[in-house]
Amino acid sequence: MHTSPAFRPLPSLAGARAESVPGVKLQKLRRAALDAREAFVKEGPVAAIATCDLITFPYPAQFAFSGAALSPAPYVMMTNRMQVVQFVDREGERRTLLFNPSDYEKGYAAPFYRALRERYGTFVTDKVMSTRHGSVQSHLASLGLTPADVDYLAFDHLHLQDLRGWLGGDGLPAYFPRARLLVQRAEWELVKNLHPMQTVWFVPGGAEVPQERVVLLEGDVWLGQGAALLSTPGHTQGNMSLAVATSREVFVVSENGVATESYTPLLSAIPGVRRFAEHLGWEVVLNGNTREDSLDQYTSMVVEKMFAGMSTVEGAFVNFHPSSQLTSHLMAPALAPTIVLPAPNFGDVRPAARRAA
């Protein structure tokens, strides 16, 4: 197991995080996120980012907007996505990060989705309620990348993840021969010591990988030019968000919210969401399938909101892109997103063999 000496911390945020009073901490982090964003953008854009759709799947409607959305449908539909990010690190090397490379077929081993299959049957769960768009392997091939091109894997959190196929473990060979997992120390300690109320969302044994393939992070990490991982605890204790700067804007990606309107709920056309936010006085509405750290999750969403800024395409909405994007579906009436922003894509993803050319 490794720490991350080659990565820099983002400025301003760590001091604000040390505040113990939740309301004061929120305001300090609101200001600190703006300061950190300014420094982040000044350094210049990322080399490249590509967004790849993996699978559309059902998710309890009561969780998606913390119970605010009014619909007879028991499930919303969400599309899980992977970002392929290439950035130049402090040594001047172009590195490749896969953010949320979900091995989604193995994710069905998590108790929640295993029970869903048992309730509805494999055909309905896999064919009617789900749509497969492509695997991690097929998307990498379409981008001209090989497994050996990948330097790092990271996830916003480890719900539904089985890392063994990617990194080895439990007798399995590693699909990625060089890649190391970047994970917050708090997330790693959580998944190794799950509370009974947390186990429903985790794949049993999914984190049993060789320790030398794991890099533990402590807070906000500046990976390289135009690429960072923000510590955004709350949804899980070690939740983190991808931040990417292009020449025009900053993208932020996580699953703290299920749609960009989660960050501007007064603009939501989904029945119930705007009224819910008005009634409670909330400026963000949580993806609420975990409740142990809701204050932290709310604060983290404000950090994401400040760091991302507003969309250059739809200026009233925050440039937040859910790792699992709320998706229109016939089985989810009145639960379509108000708006879907163009997916994060920028630059030219290059295989390692062409990087020096």
Language-model segment annotations:
Residues 98-100, 151-158, 182-184, 231-234, ...:
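Active-site neighborhood of phospho(di)ester-bond hydrolases with catalytic His/Asp-centered motifs
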Residues 42-49, 86-96, 221-229, 248-251:
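Beta-strand-turn-beta hairpins that frame and shape the catalytic cleft
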Residues 56-139, 241-257:
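Conserved beta-strand hairpin/beta-sheet module of binuclear metal-dependent hydrolase folds
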Residues 104-105, 128-134, 139-141, 145, 175, 194-197, 204-208, 220-221, ...:
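Metallo-beta-lactamase
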Residues 118-179:
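Active-site metal-binding motif and surrounding structural segment of the metallo-beta-lactamase
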Residues 157-164, 189, 236-240, 260-262:
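Active-site environment of divalent metal-dependent phosphoester hydrolases
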Residues 1-44, 293-357:
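C-terminal regulatory/interaction regions
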